[in-house]
Swiss-Prot record:
GO terms for cellular component: cytoplasm. Its EC number is 2.7.7.87. The keyword Nucleus does not apply. It comes from the Bacteria. This is Threonylcarbamoyl-AMP synthase.
Protein backbone atom coordinates (compact mmCIF):
# COMPACT_ATOMS: atom_id res chain seq x y z
CA UNK A 1 0.00 0.00 0.00
CA UNK A 2 1.19 3.49 -0.81
CA UNK A 3 2.01 5.64 2.20
CA UNK A 4 -0.58 8.20 3.12
CA UNK A 5 1.81 11.13 2.72
CA UNK A 6 2.39 10.17 -0.94
CA UNK A 7 -1.36 10.19 -1.53
CA UNK A 8 -1.62 13.55 0.25
CA UNK A 9 1.15 14.94 -1.98
CA UNK A 10 -0.63 13.64 -5.09
CA UNK A 11 -3.86 15.30 -3.89
CA UNK A 12 -2.03 18.58 -3.40
CA UNK A 13 -0.54 18.28 -6.89
CA UNK A 14 -3.96 17.59 -8.44
CA UNK A 15 -5.44 20.63 -6.69
CA UNK A 16 -2.60 22.66 -8.26
CA UNK A 17 -3.49 21.47 -11.78
CA UNK A 18 -1.34 18.34 -12.13
CA UNK A 19 -1.99 15.38 -14.40
CA UNK A 20 -0.81 12.23 -12.63
CA UNK A 21 -0.67 8.49 -13.20
CA UNK A 22 -1.83 5.96 -10.62
CA UNK A 23 -2.67 2.25 -10.38
CA UNK A 24 -6.31 1.19 -10.65
CA UNK A 25 -8.13 -2.13 -10.46
CA UNK A 26 -6.88 -3.44 -13.84
CA UNK A 27 -4.56 -0.94 -15.56
CA UNK A 28 -2.72 2.27 -14.78
CA UNK A 29 -4.79 5.42 -15.08
CA UNK A 30 -4.21 9.07 -15.82
CA UNK A 31 -6.21 11.59 -13.87
CA UNK A 32 -6.70 15.20 -12.92
CA UNK A 33 -9.21 17.58 -11.37
CA UNK A 34 -12.35 17.45 -13.56
CA UNK A 35 -13.14 21.09 -12.80
CA UNK A 36 -9.72 22.28 -14.03
CA UNK A 37 -10.34 22.81 -17.74
CA UNK A 38 -6.67 23.40 -18.52
CA UNK A 39 -5.62 20.18 -16.77
CA UNK A 40 -8.30 18.14 -18.56
CA UNK A 41 -7.33 19.48 -21.98
CA UNK A 42 -3.68 18.78 -21.21
CA UNK A 43 -4.57 15.19 -20.25
CA UNK A 44 -6.49 14.82 -23.52
CA UNK A 45 -3.52 16.18 -25.49
CA UNK A 46 -1.09 13.84 -23.69
CA UNK A 47 -3.26 10.86 -24.71
CA UNK A 48 -4.12 12.24 -28.17
CA UNK A 49 -7.76 11.67 -27.21
CA UNK A 50 -10.47 13.81 -28.81
CA UNK A 51 -12.59 15.79 -26.34
CA UNK A 52 -15.72 14.56 -28.15
CA UNK A 53 -15.27 11.06 -26.70
CA UNK A 54 -15.86 12.16 -23.11
CA UNK A 55 -14.16 10.88 -19.97
CA UNK A 56 -14.93 8.79 -16.88
CA UNK A 57 -15.30 10.31 -13.43
CA UNK A 58 -14.27 8.16 -10.48
CA UNK A 59 -15.01 8.69 -6.79
CA UNK A 60 -14.47 7.01 -3.45
CA UNK A 61 -18.18 6.84 -2.62
CA UNK A 62 -21.52 7.43 -4.30
CA UNK A 63 -22.15 10.63 -2.31
CA UNK A 64 -19.45 12.40 -4.31
CA UNK A 65 -21.82 12.18 -7.29
CA UNK A 66 -24.97 13.32 -5.44
CA UNK A 67 -25.06 16.63 -7.31
CA UNK A 68 -25.96 14.67 -10.47
CA UNK A 69 -28.68 12.49 -8.92
CA UNK A 70 -31.35 14.99 -7.83
CA UNK A 71 -34.09 13.77 -10.18
CA UNK A 72 -32.94 10.19 -10.67
CA UNK A 73 -35.41 7.32 -10.22
CA UNK A 74 -34.83 5.19 -7.13
CA UNK A 75 -34.21 2.20 -9.41
CA UNK A 76 -31.17 3.93 -10.94
CA UNK A 77 -29.74 4.80 -7.55
CA UNK A 78 -30.25 1.20 -6.41
CA UNK A 79 -28.50 -0.13 -9.53
CA UNK A 80 -25.44 2.00 -8.87
CA UNK A 81 -25.37 1.40 -5.12
CA UNK A 82 -25.60 -2.38 -5.57
CA UNK A 83 -22.50 -2.48 -7.80
CA UNK A 84 -20.25 0.07 -6.07
CA UNK A 85 -17.54 0.21 -5.05
CA UNK A 86 -16.35 -2.06 -7.79
CA UNK A 87 -15.54 -2.54 -11.46
CA UNK A 88 -18.83 -1.17 -12.79
CA UNK A 89 -19.08 2.08 -14.70
CA UNK A 90 -22.53 3.54 -15.29
CA UNK A 91 -23.53 5.93 -18.06
CA UNK A 92 -25.94 8.42 -16.49
CA UNK A 93 -27.61 11.58 -17.82
CA UNK A 94 -25.48 14.58 -16.89
CA UNK A 95 -28.42 17.02 -17.18
CA UNK A 96 -26.02 19.75 -18.39
CA UNK A 97 -24.43 19.86 -14.94
CA UNK A 98 -20.97 19.01 -16.29
CA UNK A 99 -18.77 20.82 -18.80
CA UNK A 100 -18.24 19.45 -22.30
CA UNK A 101 -14.57 18.77 -21.59
CA UNK A 102 -15.86 15.93 -19.36
CA UNK A 103 -18.93 14.77 -21.29
CA UNK A 104 -17.74 15.25 -24.85
CA UNK A 105 -20.66 15.12 -27.28
CA UNK A 106 -22.67 12.76 -25.08
CA UNK A 107 -25.90 13.26 -23.13
CA UNK A 108 -24.48 10.93 -20.48
CA UNK A 109 -21.37 10.80 -18.33
CA UNK A 110 -19.50 7.69 -17.21
CA UNK A 111 -19.28 7.29 -13.40
CA UNK A 112 -17.54 4.70 -11.23
CA UNK A 113 -16.88 4.32 -7.52
CA UNK A 114 -13.49 2.65 -7.39
CA UNK A 115 -12.58 -0.13 -5.02
CA UNK A 116 -8.82 0.41 -5.38
CA UNK A 117 -7.63 1.51 -1.91
CA UNK A 118 -5.04 4.06 -3.07
CA UNK A 119 -7.39 5.69 -5.57
CA UNK A 120 -10.20 5.72 -2.99
CA UNK A 121 -7.93 7.53 -0.56
CA UNK A 122 -6.98 10.02 -3.27
CA UNK A 123 -10.63 10.67 -4.20
CA UNK A 124 -11.52 11.06 -0.52
CA UNK A 125 -9.03 13.94 -0.40
CA UNK A 126 -9.82 15.70 -3.70
CA UNK A 127 -13.29 14.56 -4.71
CA UNK A 128 -14.13 12.96 -8.05
CA UNK A 129 -11.31 12.61 -10.56
CA UNK A 130 -11.08 12.31 -14.29
CA UNK A 131 -9.79 8.79 -14.88
CA UNK A 132 -8.70 7.32 -18.17
CA UNK A 133 -6.39 4.49 -19.04
CA UNK A 134 -2.70 5.39 -19.16
CA UNK A 135 -1.94 4.93 -22.82
CA UNK A 136 -1.61 7.05 -25.93
CA UNK A 137 -4.59 6.59 -28.27
CA UNK A 138 -4.32 3.28 -30.10
CA UNK A 139 -1.73 1.74 -27.76
CA UNK A 140 -2.32 -0.90 -25.07
CA UNK A 141 -3.13 0.39 -21.59
CA UNK A 142 -0.14 0.47 -19.24
CA UNK A 143 -0.02 -2.43 -16.77
CA UNK A 144 3.21 -1.31 -15.12
CA UNK A 145 4.80 1.86 -13.82
CA UNK A 146 7.65 1.31 -16.28
CA UNK A 147 5.21 1.36 -19.22
CA UNK A 148 3.62 4.57 -17.87
CA UNK A 149 7.05 6.18 -17.74
CA UNK A 150 7.89 4.94 -21.26
CA UNK A 151 4.63 6.32 -22.64
CA UNK A 152 4.56 9.66 -20.81
CA UNK A 153 8.07 10.62 -19.64
CA UNK A 154 8.22 14.39 -19.38
CA UNK A 155 4.52 14.84 -20.16
CA UNK A 156 2.79 14.11 -16.85
CA UNK A 157 3.43 15.76 -13.50
CA UNK A 158 3.78 12.71 -11.30
CA UNK A 159 3.25 9.03 -10.69
CA UNK A 160 1.53 7.76 -7.56
CA UNK A 161 3.12 4.37 -7.02
CA UNK A 162 1.38 1.21 -5.99
CA UNK A 163 0.06 -2.08 -7.29
CA UNK A 164 -2.76 -2.82 -9.66
CA UNK A 165 -5.89 -4.26 -8.09
CA UNK A 166 -5.63 -7.67 -9.71
CA UNK A 167 -8.41 -7.42 -12.29
CA UNK A 168 -7.59 -8.57 -15.81
CA UNK A 169 -10.03 -6.33 -17.67
CA UNK A 170 -11.27 -2.75 -17.42
CA UNK A 171 -14.62 -2.10 -15.79
CA UNK A 172 -17.92 -3.09 -17.33
CA UNK A 173 -19.78 -0.06 -18.74
CA UNK A 174 -23.59 -0.12 -18.49
CA UNK A 175 -26.38 2.24 -19.42
CA UNK A 176 -28.26 3.28 -16.28
CA UNK A 177 -31.66 3.50 -17.99
CA UNK A 178 -31.60 -0.03 -19.42
CA UNK A 179 -28.82 -1.77 -17.44
CA UNK A 180 -27.55 -2.98 -20.83
CA UNK A 181 -23.82 -3.62 -21.14
CA UNK A 182 -22.15 -1.09 -23.44
CA UNK A 183 -18.63 -2.47 -22.91
CA UNK A 184 -17.87 -5.86 -21.40
CA UNK A 185 -15.26 -5.94 -18.65
Amino acid sequence: MVSSWRVQQAAQDIRAGAVIAYPTEAVWGLGCDPWDEEAVYRLLAIKSRPVEKGLILIADNIRQFDFLFEDFPELWLDRMASTWPGPNTWLVPHQNLLPEWITGIHETVALRVTDHPTVRELCALVGPLISTSANPAGRPAARSRLRVEQYFRGQIDGVLGGSLGGRRNPSVIRDIATAQIVRAG
